[in-house]
From Swiss-Prot:
Cofactors demanded by this protein: Mg(2+)
Gene that encodes it: rnmV
Gene Ontology molecular functions: metal ion binding; ribonuclease M5 activity; rRNA binding
UniProt-recorded name of the protein: Ribonuclease M5
Localisation: Cytoplasm
Organism encoding this protein: Borreliella burgdorferi (strain ATCC 35210 / DSM 4680 / CIP 102532 / B31) (Borrelia burgdorferi)
GO biological process, one term: rRNA processing
Length: 181
Protein backbone atom coordinates (compact mmCIF):
# COMPACT_ATOMS: atom_id res chain seq x y z
CA UNK A 1 0.00 0.00 0.00
CA UNK A 2 1.32 3.44 -0.91
CA UNK A 3 2.07 5.98 1.80
CA UNK A 4 1.09 9.66 1.73
CA UNK A 5 3.39 12.06 3.56
CA UNK A 6 0.83 14.70 4.52
CA UNK A 7 -1.88 14.30 7.16
CA UNK A 8 -5.29 13.99 5.51
CA UNK A 9 -8.16 15.88 7.15
CA UNK A 10 -11.66 14.45 6.73
CA UNK A 11 -15.04 15.02 8.38
CA UNK A 12 -15.85 11.69 10.03
CA UNK A 13 -14.87 8.13 10.89
CA UNK A 14 -16.44 6.61 7.75
CA UNK A 15 -14.39 9.02 5.61
CA UNK A 16 -11.30 7.97 7.57
CA UNK A 17 -12.02 4.29 6.86
CA UNK A 18 -12.43 5.01 3.14
CA UNK A 19 -9.03 6.76 2.98
CA UNK A 20 -7.30 4.02 5.00
CA UNK A 21 -8.56 1.40 2.51
CA UNK A 22 -6.52 3.11 -0.19
CA UNK A 23 -3.41 4.53 1.51
CA UNK A 24 -1.08 4.07 4.43
CA UNK A 25 -1.44 7.52 5.93
CA UNK A 26 -2.36 9.53 8.99
CA UNK A 27 -5.93 10.81 8.93
CA UNK A 28 -7.57 13.28 11.31
CA UNK A 29 -11.33 13.65 11.62
CA UNK A 30 -12.87 17.06 12.31
CA UNK A 31 -16.00 15.36 13.68
CA UNK A 32 -18.16 17.97 12.01
CA UNK A 33 -18.28 21.74 12.45
CA UNK A 34 -17.04 22.02 16.02
CA UNK A 35 -13.28 21.82 15.64
CA UNK A 36 -11.75 21.10 19.04
CA UNK A 37 -8.76 23.12 20.25
CA UNK A 38 -6.72 19.87 20.39
CA UNK A 39 -7.53 19.16 16.74
CA UNK A 40 -6.48 22.66 15.70
CA UNK A 41 -3.19 22.34 17.63
CA UNK A 42 -2.55 18.98 15.99
CA UNK A 43 -3.24 20.41 12.53
CA UNK A 44 -0.92 23.38 13.21
CA UNK A 45 1.82 20.96 14.22
CA UNK A 46 1.24 18.84 11.10
CA UNK A 47 1.35 21.97 8.98
CA UNK A 48 4.83 22.82 10.27
CA UNK A 49 6.02 19.25 9.89
CA UNK A 50 4.84 17.86 6.54
CA UNK A 51 1.63 19.63 5.64
CA UNK A 52 -2.02 18.63 5.40
CA UNK A 53 -4.52 17.71 2.72
CA UNK A 54 -8.12 18.73 3.30
CA UNK A 55 -10.62 16.31 1.77
CA UNK A 56 -14.19 17.10 2.80
CA UNK A 57 -17.56 16.22 1.33
CA UNK A 58 -18.46 18.28 -1.76
CA UNK A 59 -21.56 19.76 -0.12
CA UNK A 60 -22.17 23.03 1.73
CA UNK A 61 -21.13 21.53 5.09
CA UNK A 62 -17.86 20.25 3.65
CA UNK A 63 -17.03 23.68 2.24
CA UNK A 64 -17.80 25.37 5.57
CA UNK A 65 -15.52 22.93 7.42
CA UNK A 66 -12.76 23.50 4.83
CA UNK A 67 -13.09 27.29 5.27
CA UNK A 68 -12.98 26.97 9.08
CA UNK A 69 -9.76 24.95 8.92
CA UNK A 70 -8.12 27.53 6.65
CA UNK A 71 -9.36 30.33 8.93
CA UNK A 72 -7.81 28.70 12.03
CA UNK A 73 -4.56 27.72 10.30
CA UNK A 74 -4.15 30.73 8.01
CA UNK A 75 -3.29 30.70 4.33
CA UNK A 76 -0.31 28.43 3.90
CA UNK A 77 1.33 26.66 0.98
CA UNK A 78 1.50 23.48 3.09
CA UNK A 79 -2.31 23.25 3.05
CA UNK A 80 -3.34 21.24 0.02
CA UNK A 81 -6.93 20.89 -1.11
CA UNK A 82 -8.37 17.69 -2.55
CA UNK A 83 -11.82 17.90 -4.11
CA UNK A 84 -14.35 15.25 -5.04
CA UNK A 85 -15.35 15.31 -8.70
CA UNK A 86 -19.10 15.26 -8.14
CA UNK A 87 -21.16 17.92 -6.34
CA UNK A 88 -22.95 16.90 -3.12
CA UNK A 89 -20.93 13.70 -2.76
CA UNK A 90 -19.64 12.29 0.51
CA UNK A 91 -16.06 11.04 0.84
CA UNK A 92 -17.27 7.76 2.37
CA UNK A 93 -19.37 6.97 -0.73
CA UNK A 94 -16.68 7.60 -3.35
CA UNK A 95 -15.11 4.48 -4.87
CA UNK A 96 -11.55 3.50 -3.99
CA UNK A 97 -10.22 4.20 -7.50
CA UNK A 98 -11.43 7.81 -7.40
CA UNK A 99 -9.99 8.35 -3.89
CA UNK A 100 -6.61 7.08 -5.11
CA UNK A 101 -6.71 9.33 -8.19
CA UNK A 102 -7.72 12.42 -6.17
CA UNK A 103 -5.11 11.98 -3.43
CA UNK A 104 -2.30 11.02 -5.79
CA UNK A 105 -3.04 14.27 -7.61
CA UNK A 106 -2.31 16.43 -4.56
CA UNK A 107 -0.41 14.24 -2.09
CA UNK A 108 3.26 13.42 -1.79
CA UNK A 109 3.93 9.70 -1.97
CA UNK A 110 6.70 8.55 0.35
CA UNK A 111 8.55 5.51 1.57
CA UNK A 112 9.28 5.63 5.30
CA UNK A 113 11.89 3.46 6.93
CA UNK A 114 9.77 0.99 8.92
CA UNK A 115 12.57 -0.11 11.26
CA UNK A 116 12.61 3.19 13.18
CA UNK A 117 8.89 3.17 13.94
CA UNK A 118 7.46 2.70 17.42
CA UNK A 119 5.33 -0.37 18.11
CA UNK A 120 2.40 -0.89 20.47
CA UNK A 121 4.73 -3.05 22.59
CA UNK A 122 6.98 0.02 23.11
CA UNK A 123 4.03 2.03 24.40
CA UNK A 124 2.99 -0.83 26.66
CA UNK A 125 6.54 -1.13 28.03
CA UNK A 126 6.60 2.61 28.81
CA UNK A 127 3.21 2.51 30.53
CA UNK A 128 1.58 4.75 27.92
CA UNK A 129 -1.03 2.13 27.04
CA UNK A 130 -2.42 -0.77 29.01
CA UNK A 131 -3.49 -1.04 32.62
CA UNK A 132 -3.27 2.18 34.69
CA UNK A 133 -1.79 4.12 31.75
CA UNK A 134 -4.37 6.88 31.27
CA UNK A 135 -2.39 9.58 33.10
CA UNK A 136 0.87 8.84 31.24
CA UNK A 137 -0.94 8.68 27.88
CA UNK A 138 -2.63 12.04 28.50
CA UNK A 139 0.70 13.64 29.50
CA UNK A 140 2.31 12.41 26.28
CA UNK A 141 -0.65 13.47 24.12
CA UNK A 142 -0.68 16.93 25.70
CA UNK A 143 3.09 17.52 25.62
CA UNK A 144 3.52 16.49 21.99
CA UNK A 145 0.18 18.11 20.89
CA UNK A 146 -1.16 14.81 19.54
CA UNK A 147 -4.83 15.27 20.38
CA UNK A 148 -7.05 12.61 21.90
CA UNK A 149 -7.41 9.12 20.55
CA UNK A 150 -7.10 5.42 21.18
CA UNK A 151 -3.83 3.45 21.29
CA UNK A 152 -3.66 2.95 17.53
CA UNK A 153 -4.24 6.64 16.78
CA UNK A 154 -1.62 7.61 19.35
CA UNK A 155 0.91 5.21 17.84
CA UNK A 156 0.16 6.45 14.33
CA UNK A 157 0.65 10.09 15.36
CA UNK A 158 3.84 9.39 17.32
CA UNK A 159 5.28 7.69 14.23
CA UNK A 160 4.03 10.41 11.90
CA UNK A 161 5.91 13.06 13.89
CA UNK A 162 8.94 10.73 14.23
CA UNK A 163 8.81 10.84 18.03
CA UNK A 164 11.32 8.31 19.34
CA UNK A 165 11.10 5.96 22.31
CA UNK A 166 13.84 7.96 24.05
CA UNK A 167 11.77 11.16 23.65
CA UNK A 168 8.85 9.43 25.33
CA UNK A 169 11.04 8.07 28.15
CA UNK A 170 12.55 11.51 28.77
CA UNK A 171 9.17 13.22 28.83
CA UNK A 172 7.70 10.65 31.21
CA UNK A 173 10.74 10.99 33.48
CA UNK A 174 10.26 14.78 33.56
CA UNK A 175 6.54 14.71 34.21
CA UNK A 176 6.64 11.84 36.69
CA UNK A 177 9.57 13.10 38.78
CA UNK A 178 8.69 14.51 42.22
CA UNK A 179 8.56 18.29 42.31
CA UNK A 180 10.82 20.17 44.70
CA UNK A 181 9.35 22.99 46.73
Amino acid sequence: MEKIKEIIVVEGKDDLKRIKESFDCTVIETKGFALKIETIKLLKKALKYKGIIILTDSDKSGNIIRQKIVKYLGENNKIKHAYLNTKDTEVESVNKTEIIKILKGVGTLSKDNQKDLLKLSDLLELGIIGENSKENRQKIQKHFCLGDGNSKKLLERLNYFKIKKTDLKNQLALTNSPRRT
